[in-house]
Curated annotation (Swiss-Prot):
Pfam families: SecB (PF02556). Belongs to the SecB family. GO terms for molecular function: unfolded protein binding. InterPro entries: SecB, SecB-like_sf. Homotetramer, a dimer of dimers. One homotetramer interacts with 1 SecA dimer. Gene3D superfamilies: SecB-like (3.10.420.10). This is Protein-export protein SecB. GO terms for biological process: protein folding; protein tetramerization; protein transport. Its main location: cytoplasm. GO terms for cellular component: cytoplasm.
Length: 166
C-alpha cells in the first residue's frame, strides 16, 4: 500500500508552510472633523471646492503582524473660508505568515489599502454628513496602479543616478 502525501505533511508539528494573510482588526486610529466657519458657512450659496489627499503607511506591529494605515485628508473651501476639514487615519492589523519578503510591499501598500478603503470612505462620509454638509462619496482608488506607478518612478530615479551616489 502506498503512503499518501498531502495536507497532513504540510502541518508538521503544527506548522504550516503555505502563505497566509488575514485581517485581524480594522479601526479608526485618528479622526478629526473641523468646522471653523460655522455658522456662517451654512448660508454660503456656492458649493465648496474639495481637495482630497491620501497617504499609506505600514509598519511591523509584532511577529507576523503588520499595521497598515490609510490617511485621508479632506478640505472643503468656499472662497477664503474653510467649510470643513477632515483628517482620518484608518488602520488595519494584518497577520502575514510565510510570505516572501519581496511580496510584502505590494500587499502592504496596494492590497491592504484596497481592503481598508471602503470602510475608511464610510467613516469620512459619515463625519462630513454629521457636520451638516452633503455627504462626500470618494471614488474608488486603484491602489495597485498607484503602487506600480510609484515603484516605476523609484526605479527610474535610481537608474538616473550615477553609480556610487546615493
Amino acid at each position: 500500500m502506498s503512503e499518501e502525501t498531502g495536507a497532513a505533511d504540510t502541518l508538521t508539528n503544527g506548522e504550516d508552510h503555505l502563505p497566509q494573510v488575514a485581517l485581524i482588526a480594522q479601526y479608526v486610529k485618528d479622526l478629526s472633523f473641523e468646522n471653523p466657519s460655522a455658522p456662517g458657512i451654512y448660508q454660503a450659496p456656492e458649493q465648496p471646492k474639495i481637495d482630497v489627499q491620501f497617504n499609506i503607511g505600514s509598519q511591523q506591529a509584532g511577529e507576523d503582524v503588520y499595521e497598515v494605515a490609510l490617511k485621508i485628508e479632506i478640505k472643503a473651501t468656499q472662497g477664503d473660508l474653510t467649510a470643513y476639514a477632515v483628517e482620518l487615519v484608518y488602520a488595519g492589523l494584518f497577520g502575514i505568515r510565510n510570505v516572501p519578503e519581496e511580496h510584502l510591499p505590494p500587499f502592504l501598500l496596494a492590497e491592504a489599502p484596497r481592503l481598508l478603503f471602503p470602510f475608511a470612505r464610510r467613516v469620512a462620509a459619515d463625519a462630513i454628513r454629521d457636520g451638516n454638509f452633503p455627504s462626500l462619496v470618494l471614488e474608488p482608488i486603484d491602489f495597485g496602479a498607484l503602487y506600480m506607478q510609484q515603484a516605476e518612478q523609484q526605479t527610474a530615479l535610481a537608474e538616473s543616478q550615477p553609480a556610487g551616489e546615493a
